[in-house]
């Protein structure tokens, strides 16, 4: 499995950022482009969900892959909510071993959650699912972190 090419995704995000005049349209295009481009990298990415923080709740704003089961998640709940509550990215090699895992799909075996920030404040996250146990290497995490950082800067 290949590592995501962060520079390629970031280049497409920058191009997408220039396409829309209104800030709301531009933000939505950036969110959807992120989900589509990350998933387009292929295996191990089964589904990619992009949540934005709204108070104490994460709200789904874009996805690519399987239809989402959760349109919102409370901070502190599940892998996504834990990432925000702890302020740390989460790499869960085997979701079956995680006590607070919230099942989105019965085929999902692993999950990687990468936070993104605006002015050092958490504003959202990229939630990646895989049907493979333990597919996300440190290099994969680092590549996704670059994409998340770029997204935070562009939003």
Language-model segments: residues:
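Intrinsically disordered, low-complexity terminal regulatory regions
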Residues: 1-67, 155
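Regulatory sensory and allosteric helical modules in signal-transduction proteins
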Residues: 45, 53-106
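A short, aliphatic-rich beta-strand micro-motif
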Residues: 110-117
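Residues at secondary-structure transition points
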Residues: 25, 70, 74, 78, ...
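Sensory-domain boundary capping and coupling elements
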Residues: 117-130
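Juxtadomain coupling helices with adjacent low-complexity linkers
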Residues: 2-3, 17, 130-155
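Short hydrophobic/aromatic beta-strand element in the GNAT-like acyltransferase core
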Residues: 47, 113, 125
